[in-house]
């Protein structure tokens, strides 16, 4: 009724916005075509709201069958498509067992394949999941558009890939935004056979845990020296993380972030630090529920106003499979020489049973890449994004 004299009209398999020509108002005022089209565009924009799309999905009878006394003004194809797409489920912690069931079958060493790494970005993206032909599909959406954070989890099915791109294309004004992220290099051939293109997103580094603990040989001389310096000059306590440390760890991140920004003026890097803080905050808030492991280093931070040891470094991570553990965060007060090397070595000591440590990628930052390579990784894993041509 609020649309009248405009109507939602079904014609064949399409949805149209029509004008009831027999309406008294239309017959009396006889508005010019330009005014009708302007208002129709306004209505089209309003009808594109999620609340309306949900309403038409639940009540398809809202749209009447086409009649000759109705003039079709504009096509509502995008709205019709959205209304008939599968409903996307918003990701919550309650979905963790379902998601993990699929992730555990993937048997990959890529850092993105853990529920924690999916969930911690919830304050930057709306995160949705959907089951298509028994495959789990995870979508991220923000103001720019929608993409898949992971490839569909399950058996590789071309029909599922096609459906996923159809869903993303509906939500994205520019189909170039539609993509599937975090695809392993060895899987890119499957996508190329479907006429899709791949682009290197990042390279992740896997180190032998044994090497990171022993720091033996010339290749690790500087790391070994840094650890020795820290142990000799600071009375640090290496402690398992607990919830009461949360506030101090968040303060440490903010201090560390300021230090990094002072050293690196690149605007993209600085934005990454701000985005990462939101994910770090979420990780600490849901630390236990996400299955994270973490440790802190406390050092005597006594001043004229405070006494006692303060948290000057913290680190967190999660297991990817039986062989590989991923270090997700490492935050350190850079004023304490050797603290980064020390907490990393001590964390690795605690990870008994794992052969490899995934230290993640460098995100196209050369200084970070240099640091990663200085730990002499044994394997490099190419991480790709998949696009439509």
Model-predicted regions and their roles:
Residues 99, 230, 372:
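A residue-level signal for conserved active-site and pocket-lining positions in enzyme catalytic cores
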Residues 82-135, 139-140, 278:
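Amide-forming acyltransferase catalytic core, primarily the GNAT-like/NAT-type
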Residues 187-199, 225, 364-380:
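Conserved active-site alpha-helix within GNAT-family acetyltransferase domains
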Residues 112-183, 299-334:
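Conserved donor-binding loop and adjoining core beta-sheet/short helix segment
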Residues 244, 248-304, 308-310:
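Short, conserved active-site entrance elements at the starts or edges of catalytic domains
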Residues 2-84:
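Short loop/turn segments that flank or connect secondary-structure elements
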Residues 292-389:
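Aromatic (often tryptophan-rich) hydrophobic motifs at membrane interfaces
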Residues 193-268:
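Acyltransferase donor/substrate-recognition loop-hinge adjacent to the catalytic core
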